[in-house]
C-alpha cells in the first residue's frame, strides 16, 4: 500500500500567509516562506502555494516568493493562482516549483491542460477545482458546481464532468476543494471527494474542512483521496505534522514517517 500524503496549503495574499472561512474574511497569519520551511522540517510530504487573488486581479503569481519557498524546502512544491498560459507554467517551474496548479485558467481555456502536459509532463500539471454544493440540475447532475475567482463566479459546470475531462486532457492530479467546507474545521466533503476519486484514475487531493486527524483519516479512506490538504489545523498551532501523521497511522492509514 502506498503511503498517503499530508500537504500543508499556503494561501498567500499580498505576499503574506492568510486564512479565511469559505474563501472569506482572510486574516494575516504570517510569513509564507517561514511557514513552508517549518512544515518541511516537521515532515510534510509536499507544500502547496496558492496566490489567492492573482486570477481575480488579472496578474501573474508572486514569483519572488515562489523562489524563496523553493530554495527553503526539499520536497515537492506546487504553485497555483494566476496560471493562465503555458508561459506562466514555465515561469513557475523555472522559479522552483515541481508542479503547477491550474484552476480558473483551465476553466476558461481547457487546452492549457493538454498543452502543459505535452510540454512539461502530466506529473507537473494539477487541476485545482473549487466546488460548491448546489441543487442538481440537467447541467449539473452531480449537485456539485465549479466556481472560479475564489468562489466569486459560478460557471454552470458539473464538477464530476470537469474532473473526467481534465484527466483526458492530461492532468496528472486533481485537488478537489469544497468551498462549503473550507476553513470550517468540520471535516472534508467526503461525498464529493469519493465521487471524484471513483471517477478518475489519477491521484485526488481532498481539500477544505480539516479540523481533526480523524477528518483526514476519513478523507484518505472513505473519501478515497491520495492526499489531504491542510491549513488552519497547522497554521494556528493546534497540531504539528508529526502529531497528525502518528494519529492517522494509528487509525490504520499508512503514512510516511520521517522521525
UniProtKB/Swiss-Prot annotation:
Catalytic activity: 5-[(5-phospho-1-deoxy-D-ribulos-1-ylimino)methylamino]-1-(5-phospho-beta-D-ribosyl)imidazole-4-carboxamide + L-glutamine = D-erythro-1-(imidazol-4-yl)glycerol 3-phosphate + 5-amino-1-(5-phospho-beta-D-ribosyl)imidazole-4-carboxamide + L-glutamate + H(+)
An example Gene Ontology CC term for this record: cytoplasm
InterPro entries: Aldolase_TIM, His_biosynth, HisF, IGPS_HisA/HisF, RibuloseP-bd_barrel
Active site: 11, 130
Function in brief: IGPS catalyzes the conversion of PRFAR and glutamine to IGP, AICAR and glutamate. The HisF subunit catalyzes the cyclization activity that produces IGP and AICAR from PRFAR using the ammonia provided by the HisH subunit.
Protein name: Imidazole glycerol phosphate synthase subunit HisF
The keyword Cytoplasm is annotated on this UniProt entry: yes
E.C. number: 4.3.2.10
Any single biological process term in GO: L-histidine biosynthetic process
Subunit structure: Heterodimer of HisH and HisF.
Record keywords: Amino-acid biosynthesis, Cytoplasm, Histidine biosynthesis, Lyase
Main localization (coarse): cytoplasm
PANTHER family: IMIDAZOLE GLYCEROL PHOSPHATE SYNTHASE HISHF, IMIDAZOLE GLYCEROL PHOSPHATE SYNTHASE SUBUNIT HISF/H IGP SYNTHASE SUBUNIT HISF/H
NCBIfam families (alphabetical): hisF
Pathway membership, UniProt: Amino-acid biosynthesis; L-histidine biosynthesis; L-histidine from 5-phospho-alpha-D-ribose 1-diphosphate: step 5/9
Gene: hisF
Enzyme kind, highest EC tier: lyase
Gene Ontology MF annotations: imidazoleglycerol-phosphate synthase activity; lyase activity
Protein localization: Cytoplasm
Family: Belongs to the HisA/HisF family.
Amino acid at each position: 500500500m502506498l503511503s498517503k500524503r499530508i500537504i500543508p496549503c499556503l494561501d498567500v495574499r499580498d505576499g503574506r500567509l492568510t486564512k479565511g472561512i469559505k474563501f472569506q474574511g482572510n486574516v494575516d497569519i504570517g510569513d509564507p516562506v517561514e511557514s513552508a520551511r517549518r512544515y518541511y522540517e516537521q515532515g510534510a510530504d509536499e507544500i502547496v502555494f496558492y496566490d489567492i487573488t492573482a486570477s481575480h486581479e488579472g496578474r501573474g503569481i508572486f514569483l519572488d516568493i515562489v523562489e524563496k519557498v523553493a530554495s527553503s524546502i526539499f520536497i515537492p512544491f506546487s504553485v497555483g493562482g494566476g496560471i493562465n498560459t503555458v508561459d506562466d507554467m514555465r515561469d513557475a517551474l523555472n522559479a522552483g516549483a515541481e508542479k503547477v496548479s491550474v484552476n480558473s485558467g483551465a476553466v476558461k481555456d481547457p487546452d492549457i491542460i493538454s498543452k502543459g502536459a505535452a510540454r512539461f509532463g502530466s506529473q507537473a500539471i494539477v487541476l485545482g477545482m473549487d466546488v460548491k454544493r448546489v441543487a442538481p440540475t440537467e447541467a449539473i447532475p452531480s449537485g456539485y458546481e465549479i466556481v472560479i475567482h475564489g468562489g466569486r463566479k459560478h460557471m454552470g459546470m458539473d464538477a464530476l464532468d470537469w474532473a473526467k475531462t481534465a484527466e483526458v486532457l492530461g492532468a496528472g492530479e486533481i485537488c478537489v476543494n469544497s468551498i462549503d467546507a473550507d476553513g470550517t474545521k468540520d471535516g472534508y466533503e467526503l461525498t464529493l471527494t469519493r465521487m471524484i476519486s471513483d471517477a478518475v484514475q489519477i491521484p485526488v487531493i481532498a481539500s477544505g474542512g480539516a479540523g481533526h486527524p480523524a477528518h483526514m483519516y476519513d478523507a484518505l479512506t472513505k473519501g478515497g483521496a491520495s492526499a489531504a490538504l491542510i491549513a488552519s489545523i497547522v497554521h494556528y498551532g493546534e497540531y504539528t505534522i508529526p502529531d497528525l501523521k502518528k494519529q492517522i497511522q494509528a487509525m490504520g492509514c499508512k503514512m510516511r514517517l520521517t522521525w
